[in-house]
């Protein structure tokens, strides 16, 4: 799609003022049946599993339904802007979501987690978001290729697939 001037915004760095053209109305509920919502959550169970990787859970104020492979936008109090993180867990109508995060030098959210200042904090949450999901009704072979912390969303997909005895 590069030849059409398209790119993945999640993999881009803005270097100057820019303008985005969205051809038509984007309605997430048309493809997922979900409405992302704002809410708060409590960060808990933080555990460093490697020098630059931590896992933690969020206890959401309200239950959410999300599709395996989706993500939530997270923001610590006083932080400007949200950061997207894929859930590693999968459960329907849940108040619990699990994450694995790699330290990103200069990353406000990840640096706060690794500095230890975020433990047991409240977190602003928006979501669920994303269309890189698993739908077992498609009944197709499932091939997952990932690396690094990109494994998070795939862990959610594999969790659902295993729970359904998909393989």
Where do the protein language model's features map onto the residues?
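Long, contiguous hydrophobic alpha-helical segments, chiefly transmembrane helices and signal peptides
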Residues: 1, 7-8, 71, 85, ...
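Iron-sulfur (Fe-S) cluster-binding segments and ferredoxin-like electron-carrier domains
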Residues: 1-26
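Glycine-centered loop/turn positions within well-structured domains
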Residues: 8, 16, 64, 130, ...
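Conserved strand-loop elements at the edges of beta-sheets that form or border functional pockets
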Residues: 12, 89, 136
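Short, surface-exposed secondary-structure boundary micro-motifs
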Residues: 23-25, 77, 128
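Anionic-ligand-binding alpha/beta catalytic cores of soluble enzymes and soluble regulatory domains
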Residues: 23-35, 160-164
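Ferredoxin-reductase
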Residues: 31-122, 140
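FNR/FR-type flavoprotein reductase catalytic core
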Residues: 94-95, 101-167
């Amino acid at each position: 799609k590069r030849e059409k001037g398209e790119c993945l915004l999640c993999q881009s760095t803005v270097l100057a003022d820019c303008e985005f053209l969205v051809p038509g109305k984007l309605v997430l509920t048309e493809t997922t049946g979900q409405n992302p919502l704002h809410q708060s959550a409590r960060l808990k169970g933080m555990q460093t599993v490697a020098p630059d990787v931590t896992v933690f859970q969020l206890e959401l104020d309200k239950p959410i339904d999300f599709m395996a492979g989706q993500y939530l936008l997270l923001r610590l109090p006083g932080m400007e802007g949200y950061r997207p993180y894929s859930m590693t867990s999968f459960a329907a109508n849940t108040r619990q979501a699990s994450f694995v995060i790699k330290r990103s030098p200069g990353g406000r959210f990840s640096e706060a987690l690794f500095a230890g200042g975020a433990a047991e904090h409240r977190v602003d949450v928006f979501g669920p978001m994303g269309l890189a999901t698993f739908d077992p009704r498609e009944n197709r072979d499932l091939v997952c290729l990932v690396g690094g912390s990109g494994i998070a969303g795939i862990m959610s997909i594999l969790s659902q697939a295993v729970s359904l005895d998909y393989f």
